[in-house]
Amino acid sequence: MAYGGYSLGGLAAISSLYSSDKMPLIFSICGSFWYPNFVAYCKAHQPINKSCSVYLRNGLTEGAKHKNRLAKAPSYAKEVHELIKKQSVSTYSAFDPYGHHDHLQERYDAFSDWLIEQWKL
């Protein structure tokens, strides 16, 4: 079974690493890691679920048209990617050149391809 999501769903999925050890695979596509205090939370806590595979994908131009904390979305995402890579056994981390709402089908296709390879389907 895999659990994950896009945007806030991706944030929620990654948050679950810190509260449950039930999922063998968690994914986040364009996770909203800019959410206030999320990076600090990840730094201050260790995942409960260290044995699951984690798939992370964010865009390098997410938040580019904003002037608030969303403008730094790629920076927050990079911090979370690095933290999760250090804290979890198996983490795939990728950044693409797109904005938050761009090329969603391509992003889900990339995840599907990775999942097929991971689970040898």
Task: Describe the residue ranges of each PLM region.
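Hydrolases whose catalytic domains are alpha/beta-hydrolase-1, hotdog thioesterase
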Residues: 12-16, 37
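C-terminal catalytic histidine-bearing segment of alpha/beta-hydrolase fold enzymes
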Residues: 55-60, 74-121
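Short, flexible/disordered intra-domain loops and linkers
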Residues: 63-75
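Active-site nucleophile loop of the alpha/beta-hydrolase fold
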Residues: 27-35, 59-62
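Gly/Ala-rich beta-loop-alpha elbow adjacent to hydrolase catalytic centers
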Residues: 4-9, 13
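Conserved hydrolase catalytic core segment
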Residues: 15-25
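Flexible "cap/lid" loop of the alpha/beta hydrolase fold
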Residues: 32-50
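Residue in the alpha/beta-hydrolase core beta-strand immediately N-terminal to the catalytic nucleophile
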Residues: 1-2, 25-27
